[in-house]
Structure formats: structure tokens, C-alpha cells
Regions:
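ATP-dependent carboxylate activation and anion-phosphoryl transfer catalytic cores
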Residues: 3-157
Length: 157
């Protein structure tokens, strides 16, 4: 079953992607952004199977994930992108060194109680009406296990 990206959880930093997979993501991102002459933000969706990274799609725009990343890393990435798009700065003018003590988890917020007759099953159409962010110190946190066990996620680390 396909689940809409906006209705899913995200964890920063990634907790179950090895260096080889992360390097593929970085390499693909750089190649796509350069090939598209991207100025500003780009949204790229990847799928990973057996340590191979596949590209689903790339869009020259921001996504709902950008505010989450900015808040998690305490960096104004939208401001950086805006200044770059306006020609006031170049990418090299900003330091991109995301550091995080612990982990940040993005969780979708659903308002099904306000819409009792709506189909609650998740699929390709986005159904979340917002997001929340949870900061935890480590992956042994009870909230982390509660969130991911509900979704039957495979926890490798």
C-alpha cells in the first residue's frame, strides 16, 4: 500500500540509513539540482531497496518537510533559499552543517474527529491537516518506540 509522504513520519538525523546509502542520496541530489539549474529549494523523493537508492521524483519547490528541517536544525533554510533565489547570496555564503543533539521526529496530525464521515484509510491522497515535532534524546525513548511500533516500522538500530 502506498502512503502519502505528507502523512508519514520523518526522523532527523536518519537512524537506519548507512553511509553508503546516505552518500548515494547526496550524490543524486547534487546531480539533479545541477542538471535542473536549481536556484533555491528542491524537493526530491527517494525510495531505498537493498542499499540501492531510487529516485521517485524531483520538484523545484519547498515541501512541508522544509519547516521541520529548519526547526530541527535551528537554521532558517527558507530564508537562505529566498536570498539565493533573489540573487542576494550564493549557496557558498551559508554554512550548511546540520547538527542535532538527539533526534527530531515529524508526526502527521489528523483531524478525523472533525470530519466523521471521511474515509480514514491512508493512501495516495494526503489526509493530514498539520504536523507536530517531537524532540528526543535517544532512540530508547518510550515515545519513539510508541510512534514507530504503531506504524510497524522496522527498527534496525
Amino acid at each position: 500500500m502506498y502512503k502519502r509522504q505528507g502523512d508519514s513520519n520523518a526522523t532527523l538525523p536518519p537512524f537506519n540509513l548507512g553511509d553508503f546509502v546516505m552518500q548515494q542520496i547526496i550524490d543524486h541530489t547534487n546531480k539533479i539540482a545541477l542538471a535542473l539549474n536549481t536556484v533555491g529549494l528542491i524537493n526530491i523523493q527517494f525510495a531505498i531497496k537493498d542499499d540501492t537508492v531510487f529516485i521517485i521524483e524531483a520538484n523545484p519547490r519547498a515541501s512541508r518537510t522544509v519547516p521541520f528541517i529548519s526547526k530541527a536544525y535551528k537554521q532558517p533554510y527558507v530564508n537562505y533559499a529566498t536570498k539565493i533565489m533573489l540573487g542576494k547570496n550564493k549557496v557558498d555564503d551559508f554554512k550548511f552543517d546540520p547538527k542535532l543533539d538527539g533526534f527530531a521526529i515529524k508526526q502527521p496530525v489528523f483531524s478525523f474527529s472533525k470530519f466523521p464521515n471521511v474515509d480514514k484509510s491512508l493512501g495516495p491522497e494526503m489526509k493530514s491537516t498539520g504536523e507536530s515535532i517531537l524532540f528526543i534524546d535517544d532512540l530508547k525513548d518510550d515515545d519513539f518506540y510508541e510512534i514507530y511500533s504503531r506504524r510497524k516500522m522496522y527498527l534496525t538500530k
